[in-house]
Regions:
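Phosphate-binding glycine-rich loop
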Residues: 1-37, 51-53, 61-63, 128
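Short loop/turn motifs at secondary-structure junctions
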Residues: 9, 34, 83, 132-133, ...
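PLP-dependent aminotransferase-like
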Residues: 28-117, 121-124
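Active-site region of PLP-dependent enzymes
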Residues: 120-126, 133-203
Length: 203
């Protein structure tokens, strides 16, 4: 499975309907909302901008290197303000960003780091898989990607509790202990819901 491929714990990852859904979930997990800014490379897919705008935050575009089309800590640092809450980076075309300097910059400024691995499903940086180095990582498995399954995605969270929340919210807000997950002698037709949710599980 992908957790094994990424050399991470199964409890740190969850399949989702698409990479864009992972970015929407990331905004919610990190409590990003109105008045916040999220720095994002000027070369990126519209789904990431939609995720930022949908929660009321403002996307702030930073420049990229002309040879790799990846952003750098220098370009990110230029855009940091007191409103900045997170940074989304894209590992473009399988080439990882310089994560040492970007991770250091984010820690110095108390910023969350989201890695978009839509173009780099199994890329590594100094022996570690990209997407598992920041706070959150997202992958795409749609029909135009290197790993294809029609449509689908994966999300990694450093905090395993975040994955539990995603599992619940991606299946209509149902608690895992309710409904079809329990045996027939325990009222399988009863469902427990304690929050709103969407149906964004993988098909």
């Amino acid at each position: 499975n992908m957790a094994k491929k990424l050399n991470t714990d199964r409890k740190n990852v969850e399949t989702i309907s698409c990479c864009t859904e992972g970015l929407f979930q990331s905004m919610k997990i990190l409590n990003i909302g109105r008045g916040d800014e999220v720095i994002i490379p000027s070369i990126h897919f519209i789904g990431a901008i939609n995720a930022i705008k949908a929660c009321g935050a403002t996307p702030v575009f930073c420049d990229v290197e002309k040879d790799t089309l990846n952003t750098t800590s220098f370009y990110i640092n230029e855009k940091i303000t007191h409103k900045t809450k997170a940074v989304i980076i894209l590992h473009y075309g399988g080439t990882p960003c310089d994560l040492d300097t970007i991770v250091r910059l984010c820690k110095q400024n108390d910023l969350k780091l989201i890695e978009d691995n839509a173009n780099s499903p199994l890329s590594t940086y100094k022996g570690k898989h990209t997407g598992t180095i920041g706070d959150i990582g997202v992958w795409s498995f749609d029909s135009m990607k290197q790993i294809v399954m029609g449509d689908g995605g994966l999300i990694y969270c450093k905090d395993k509790n975040d994955i539990k929340n995603i599992q619940q919210e991606s299946y209509l807000g149902l608690l895992s202990s309710s409904g079809f997950s329990i045996s027939i002698d325990k009222k399988w037709w009863e469902f427990d819901v304690d929050r709103p949710g969407r149906r964004t599980i993988i098909n």
